[in-house]
């Protein structure tokens, strides 16, 4: 079935801050490691007529949406489908690299993708739908202990063991609604009522991270990506929860090729938070590629 690009509606976050921090070059080459619907790439391409972008995404629906959005600049952008951790630029070196992590609003808003408990759909959660493992596979085949560990480590869910025990007793679970109900029924009544978020929020986050191996691929990407930058080039990464942000922060500090630009993360303005609720948890960090001794002399 051909994806419908028009149905992939995603509002990019921290766009102004991202463009300012990249310090765009007139003839620069940029890597958008998570092109999504193409919002950030469109802004990069709009700055200068000779700027070029290589755009990656593992989600074919996102990639097709970006192709449609950026059609007028098709001579200045190349697309590649796959996870950013498996991309190889060859001899190319970039003036800037950006990544907007996590699940997009467009993915959450498409019921058939199975990311959200707001819709009744099959438990899927695959960003790359060609991969085998689904959320249903994890929920229905993993041991109680493994499920509890996933919920605790990836969702920071304090009732992880209680929830895992209930899930195992109720298996098989096939839909997002099935899972959300079981999670909600696992919590002590008073605790569930006092939560500011839906009782299943942390479990769904943890499950999505596990299905897509989000933290593992982020670590791999952030270790190799600095070698793709030209000296003076910048990498900017937007994260949406503390687990991602911690990885970005630590790797930026520890990588000898990088100098941290943002001592503290950049967050959305109050106006952007009002206009786009997804931006409330967004954190943007920048680092700059430092020249090696032989590069400084050349």
Swiss-Prot record:
One of its GO terms (cellular component) is cytoplasm. SUPFAM superfamilies: Putative methyltransferase TM0872, insert domain, S-adenosyl-L-methionine-dependent methyltransferases. It catalyses: cytidine(1402) in 16S rRNA + S-adenosyl-L-methionine = N(4)-methylcytidine(1402) in 16S rRNA + S-adenosyl-L-homocysteine + H(+). Its main location: cytoplasm. CDD domains: AdoMet_MTases (cd02440). It is an enzyme of class 2 (transferase). GO terms for biological process: rRNA base methylation. It is found in: Cytoplasm. Keywords: Cytoplasm, Methyltransferase, rRNA processing, S-adenosyl-L-methionine, Transferase. Its EC number is 2.1.1.199. It comes from the Bacteria. Pfam families: Methyltransf_5. GO terms for molecular function: rRNA (cytosine-N4-)-methyltransferase activity. The keyword Methyltransferase applies. S-adenosyl-L-methionine binds at residues 38-40, 57, 84, 100, 107. PANTHER family: 12S RRNA N4-METHYLCYTIDINE METHYLTRANSFERASE, S-ADENOSYL-METHYLTRANSFERASE MRAW. Belongs to the methyltransferase superfamily. RsmH family. NCBIfam families: 16S rRNA (cytosine(1402)-N(4))-methyltransferase RsmH. Specifically methylates the N4 position of cytidine in position 1402 (C1402) of 16S rRNA. This is Ribosomal RNA small subunit methyltransferase H. It comes from Acaryochloris marina (strain MBIC 11017). The lineage of its organism: Bacteria, Bacillati, Cyanobacteriota, Cyanophyceae, Acaryochloridales. The gene is rsmH.
């Amino acid at each position: 079935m051909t994806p419908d690009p028009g149905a992939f509606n995603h509002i990019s976050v921290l766009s102004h801050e991202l463009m300012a921090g990249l310090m765009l070059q007139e003839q620069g080459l940029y890597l958008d490691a998570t092109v999504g619907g193409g919002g950030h790439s469109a802004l990069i391409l709009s700055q200068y007529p000779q700027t070029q972008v290589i755009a990656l995404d593992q989600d074919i629906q996102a990639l097709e949406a970006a192709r449609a959005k950026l059609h007028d600049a098709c001579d200045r952008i190349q697309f590649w489908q796959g996870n950013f951790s498996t991309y190889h630029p060859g001899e190319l070196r970039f003036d800037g690299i950006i990544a907007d992590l996590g699940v997009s609003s467009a993915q959450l808003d498409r019921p058939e993708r199975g990311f959200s408990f707001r819709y009744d759909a099959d438990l899927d959660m695959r960003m790359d739908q060609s991969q085998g493992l689904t959320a249903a596979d994890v929920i229905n085949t993993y041991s109680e202990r493994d499920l509890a560990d996933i919920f605790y480590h990836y969702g920071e869910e304090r009732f992880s063991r209680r929830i895992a025990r209930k899930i195992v007793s109720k298996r098989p679970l096939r839909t997002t609604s099935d899972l959300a109900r079981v999670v909600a029924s696992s919590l002590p009544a008073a605790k569930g009522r006092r939560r500011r978020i839906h009782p299943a929020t942390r479990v769904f986050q943890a499950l999505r991270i596990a299905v897509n191996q989000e933290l593992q691929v982020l670590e791999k990407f952030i270790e190799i990506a600095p070698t793709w930058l030209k000296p003076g080039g910048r990498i900017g990464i937007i994260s949406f929860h503390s687990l991602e942000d911690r990885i970005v922060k630590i790797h930026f500090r520890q990588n000898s090729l990088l100098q941290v630009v943002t001592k503290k993360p950049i967050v959305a303005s109050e106006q952007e938070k009002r206009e786009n609720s997804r931006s409330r948890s967004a954190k943007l960090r920048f680092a700059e590629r430092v020249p090696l001794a032989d590069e400084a002399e050349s």
